[in-house]
């Protein structure tokens, strides 16, 4: 029984992995967490050689949730993108089993009237991969008809709905520059806890205050524990506005779930941050 946890990136100036050479920071990160969001691919399709280096730094059981490029999802809105999709799939092929899911993050303007285009797009994708869809239009969280419409479209290809839980961020006014920036950029939508598949994916955003972040994820401990008991295999990504503590918090989240589900396989101990010496 495994719960995979990770962060929005594999390096940050405040993390121990930042002390490693740039070419080996992913390997160092994989000693702390066993999943990562592939956000860099949103901005451009990586070279195949770059992806080969990612695969070479991680075990086959490591999970990449790789975001489709914005030219596909945001600029062309899933239309006329065959060549872009083919290029992206070719580039990420070296990940093999590490490509846990391909993540289709859609803009806030993507509304219930666009679901038919999404359904067509999903049906045309190869079944080689799992797919995970993130939406931000409030109708998908507040209108039963819109929720059912999207769930049916995802269900036809066994795709997962990725909730981005930002409720803790918006519970009180921001207190740092990073929180103020997040207030202007992050979606403000209700929390969603329904899994559609055996491989749910959760994105949780806390605050820069550690205890507030921990208090805010308590409902997820209960939900994840129940999913594990049902035989599901979840992946959870922990965010904070500045992400300075996200690496440690991701491991702590795993520990809290393991307290609720003692049979959960523990994460390996992270590598030492300083060389071991006798004196």
Language model regions located:
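Residues lining hydrophobic/aromatic ligand-binding pockets adjacent to catalytic sites
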Residues: 1-279
């Amino acid at each position: 029984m495994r719960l995979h946890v990770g962060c929005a990136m594999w390096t940050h100036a405040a993390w121990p992995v930042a002390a490693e050479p740039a070419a080996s920071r992913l390997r160092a990160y994989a000693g702390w967490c066993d999943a990562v969001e592939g956000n860099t691919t949103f901005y451009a399709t990586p070279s195949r050689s770059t992806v080969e280096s990612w695969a070479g730094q991680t075990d086959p059981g490591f999970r990449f949730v790789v975001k489709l490029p914005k030219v596909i999802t945001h600029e062309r809105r899933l239309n006329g993108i065959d060549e872009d999709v083919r290029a992206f799939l070719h580039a990420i092929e070296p990940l093999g089993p590490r490509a846990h899911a391909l993540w289709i993050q859609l803009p806030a303007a993507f509304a219930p009237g666009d679901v038919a285009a999404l359904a067509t797009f999903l049906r045309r994708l190869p079944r080689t991969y799992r797919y995970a869809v993130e939406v931000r239009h409030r109708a998908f969280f507040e209108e039963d008809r819109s929720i059912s419409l999207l769930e049916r479209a995802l269900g036809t290809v066994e795709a997962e709905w990725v909730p981005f839980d930002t409720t803790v961020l918006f519970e009180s006014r921001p207190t740092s520059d990073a929180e103020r920036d997040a207030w202007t950029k992050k979606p403000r939508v209700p929390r969603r806890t329904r899994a559609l598949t055996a491989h749910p994916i959760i994105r949780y955003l806390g605050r820069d205050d550690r205890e507030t972040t921990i208090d805010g994820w308590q409902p997820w401990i209960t939900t994840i524990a129940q999913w594990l008991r049902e035989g599901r295999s979840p992946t959870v990504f922990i965010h904070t506005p500045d992400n300075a503590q996200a690496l440690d918090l991701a491991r702590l989240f795993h520990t809290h779930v393991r307290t609720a589900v003692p049979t959960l396989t523990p994460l390996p101990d992270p590598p030492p941050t300083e060389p071991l010496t006798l004196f």
